[in-house]
Design a protein with these regions (language model features):
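A short glycine-rich, Lys/Arg-flanked "PGG" loop and its adjoining helix->strand segment in the class I
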Residues: 158-175
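Conserved class I S-adenosyl-L-methionine
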Residues: 79-89
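Short, glycine-/aromatic-enriched active-site segment of Class I SAM-dependent methyltransferases
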Residues: 180-197
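Conserved S-adenosyl-L-methionine
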Residues: 96-104
């Protein structure tokens, strides 16, 4: 079975809209089976290898698309706020924050030399590379964080929320990427590190909401990331806000989001 290339890009979460997909295809950054394709209506096989190369997605990395979707789905904005990008890597979230009005972004990552040059040289960015978020203190920052994002690997959100609680303002908002492959027991992680079972995804979201609430954050929204993880894992966006009376969403909401993610991203 074949599908239009622009449709494929949207259905598989590589690009947010058909309009943007068409523009990017025409700009020559979309490759199918290692061959550049510049016609949006090109019919391709469902199992084709499709890549978007370069930075024409509008951000230095695909992380920007994740935060972009969160801002479309949830009532949140980094505009006018002091922000933190936890697990910054290349800086997709940082880039998106700046493009949406952030006054300052602390870009935190344990790695070194990954942050895009345009962000390293931006005076609004505080590059905190070689930094484990678990060691960051309020005194080290000197000011509270008003908006934060979390996109970390090989560590559970269970370890992130206590720090987020300590360094943020009383009404801080955040977007956390929930990754089943790093929140599940080893016995539930399948071949190539991929967690496919929807029931496990529901369990992971239930636990993640619990971690948030236990550290003073209400869970105000859930949706799925428009971009799969590197190995093909479906990941989720969790919108949290600090609260004196933390509350979580009903598990039925998580189940609906999981079902929607699989029907949209798994073909």
């Amino acid at each position: 079975m074949k599908i239009r290339l622009d449709q494929y890009l949207v259905q598989h979460g590589l690009i947010q809209s058909r309009e943007r997909a068409k523009a990017m295809i025409m700009s020559g950054v979309v490759f199918v089976n290692e061959q550049k394709v510049d016609k949006a209506g090109e019919m391709i096989k469902e199992d084709a290898k499709v890549e978007v190369r370069g930075h024409d997605i509008g951000y230095v990395s695909r992380g920007g698309l994740k935060l972009e979707k969160a801002m479309q789905c949830f009532p949140l904005t980094p505009n006018g706020k002091v922000c933190m990008d936890i697990g910054a890597s290349t800086g997709g979230f940082t880039d998106c924050m700046l493009q949406n009005g952030a006054v300052k972004v602390y870009a935190v990552d344990v790695g070194y030399g990954q942050l895009a040059w345009k962000l390293r040289t931006d005076e609004r960015v505080v590059n905190m590379e070689r930094t484990n978020i678990r060691s960051v203190t309020p005194d080290q920052l000197g000011e509270p964080i008003e908006f934060f994002s979390v996109d970390v690997s090989f560590i559970s959100l269970h370890h992130i929320f206590p720090v987020a609680q300590a360094i943020t303002t009383p009404d801080a908002m955040g977007v956390c990427l929930v990754k089943p492959q790093f929140e599940s027991g080893r016995e539930k992680v399948g071949k190539n590190g991929v967690v496919r079972d929807p029931a496990t995804h529901c369990e992971v979201l239930h636990n993640a909401m619990g971690y948030a609430a236990a550290n003073g954050f209400s869970v105000r929204g859930l949706d799925f990331s428009p971009v799969k993880g590197p190995e093909g894992n479906i990941e989720y966006l969790m919108f949290v806000q600090k609260s004196a009376e933390p509350a979580v969403l009903d598990d039925s909401v998580a189940k609906q989001v999981v079902e929607a993610s699989h029907s949209t991203l798994d073909h």
